[in-house]
């Protein structure tokens, strides 16, 4: 119950973050992480793998970039689809996944399209 409550609080707090203007360039993985993902991944809220924690990220990295990106887009356990930000493009989510995974030891290129 606590995990679900924390996830809902994180998702609700993300609604206050502004979206980029229409026609703007897609955000980088770092920009998405800092404005969306850090709310949970910086502190490990609801068992989210912490940013830079190589041990926690190792099995996720082993799943591969495409699989991990699909999971982030669809959501898993306490993490809602797109981290609770439906305004994010799939490209922006994939970029954030690469940024988080790279901080945990992956060597993935940031998706260009």
Where are the model-predicted features located?
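Axial heme c-ligation environment in periplasmic c-type cytochrome domains
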Residues: 50, 71-95, 100-113
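Residue-level recognition of specific faces of alpha-helices
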Residues: 36-39, 56, 78
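Bacterial N-terminal signal peptides
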Residues: 7-17
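Gly/Gly-Pro-rich "capping" loops immediately C-terminal to redox-active cysteine motifs
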Residues: 41-70, 83
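The canonical Cys-X-X-Cys-His
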Residues: 34-43, 96
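Electrostatic cytochrome c docking/interface patches
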Residues: 15-32, 45-59
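Positively charged n-region of N-terminal signal peptides that target proteins for export
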Residues: 1-5
């Amino acid at each position: 119950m606590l995990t679900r409550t924390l996830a809902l609080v994180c998702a609700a707090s993300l609604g206050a973050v502004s979206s980029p203007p229409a026609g703007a360039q897609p955000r980088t993985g770092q920009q998405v992480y800092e404005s969306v993902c850090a709310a949970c991944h910086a502190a490990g809220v609801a068992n989210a793998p912490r940013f830079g924690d190589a041990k926690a990220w190792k099995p996720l990295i082993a799943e591969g970039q495409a699989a991990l990106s699909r999971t982030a887009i669809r959501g898993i356990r306490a993490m809602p689809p797109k981290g609770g930000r439906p305004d994010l493009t799939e490209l922006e989510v994939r970029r954030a996944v690469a940024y988080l995974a790279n901080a945990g030891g992956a060597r993935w290129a940031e998706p260009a399209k």
